[in-house]
Structures are given as structure tokens and as C-alpha cells.
Curated annotation (Swiss-Prot):
The lineage of its organism: Bacteria, Pseudomonadati, Pseudomonadota, Gammaproteobacteria, Enterobacterales. It comes from Photorhabdus laumondii subsp. laumondii (strain DSM 15139 / CIP 105565 / TT01). Coiled coil: none annotated. [2Fe-2S] cluster binds at residues 91, 96, 102. GO terms for biological process: negative regulation of DNA-templated transcription. Keywords: 2Fe-2S, DNA-binding, Iron, Iron-sulfur, Metal-binding, Repressor, Transcription, Transcription regulation. One of its GO terms (cellular component) is cytosol. Residues 2-129 form the HTH rrf2-type domain. This is HTH-type transcriptional repressor NsrR.
Length: 141
């Protein structure tokens, strides 16, 4: 399983915001510069994260973006659930004639649940706490 770029960059944006001092706002442009992703793509990601309450977006001259809640309260599993389409196979009566007897979907759903359970053990704070190499990469120019 590979996360979509939407989820990947959503997590990266959250990690960047979490690495900043709490009072510091950042901008979408700053995040796109750090990660080399298109501004249009990042705008969509930040809009979704804002809608979920994970990012506060403040408009105006002194505006910007920042985490919408403390990093210790943002579980990685919750972010992935919110951003990622988690169906590994496309099972429907119309496209597959073994759907009614297939056990593969059950096994794959169990695998997804184990994956998410592991991600739920980790918060955004865990990703940045005492991570000096991360700070050096993100916060030095």
C-alpha cells in the first residue's frame, strides 16, 4: 500500500507546522518551497486539513496557517483515515462475479485496520520530538 501524494504532503505539511514555534504562522508558499510541491496541490491539501480542524487558516496581511490543535493531539492514523481512500480493492457486484463468496476483501480490510492501529500509536508530536536532524533539514536555509 502506498499513500497518495495528497496524504503524503498533508502529513509533511503538518510535520512542518508542528516543528515551528507555536506562535509562528507559516504560509502555503513556505510549505511548498520546503517540499517542492505545486502551490495548487498544497492549497487543496491545506483546505482539507483546515476543514478537518487540523489547520487554522487566518486570512489577511498578518495571516497564514498553523496547527489547529496541539501536535500531541493529532494521531497519524486519524490524519490518514481523513485524507486517504482506504479501499485496497474495488469490489462491486457489477464488476466482479465472485464478490458474494470472496474472502480477500475481508483479509485486506483486516490488514488496513492493523495498519491504522499502528499509526494510531503515534502522534504528530512523536514525529518531531527530539528530532534534531528534522529540525536541521526543515528550519535551516
Amino acid at each position: 500500500m502506498q499513500l497518495t501524494s495528497f496524504t503524503d504532503y498533508g502529513l509533511r505539511a503538518l510535520i512542518y507546522m508542528a516543528s515551528l514555534p507555536q506562535s509562528r504562522m507559516t504560509s502555503i508558499s513556505e510549505v511548498t518551497d520546503i517540499y517542492g510541491v505545486s502551490r495548487n496541490h498544497m492549497v487543496k491539501i491545506i483546505n482539507q486539513l483546515s476543514h478537518l480542524g487540523l489547520v487554522d487558516a487566518v486570512r489577511g496581511k498578518n495571516g497564514g496557517i498553523r496547527l489547529g490543535k496541539p501536535a500531541k493531539d493529532i494521531r497519524i492514523g486519524d490524519v490518514v483515515r481523513a485524507l486517504e481512500p482506504l479501499s485496497l480493492v474495488n469490489c462491486s457486484q457489477e464488476s466482479c462475479h465472485i464478490t458474494s463468496a470472496c474472502r480477500l476483501k475481508v483479509v485486506l480490510n483486516q490488514a488496513i485496520e492493523r495498519f491504522l492501529e499502528e499509526l494510531d500509536k503515534h502522534t504528530l508530536a512523536d514525529m518531531i520530538e527530539d528530532n534534531i536532524p528534522l529540525y536541521k533539514l526543515l528550519l535551516t536555509e
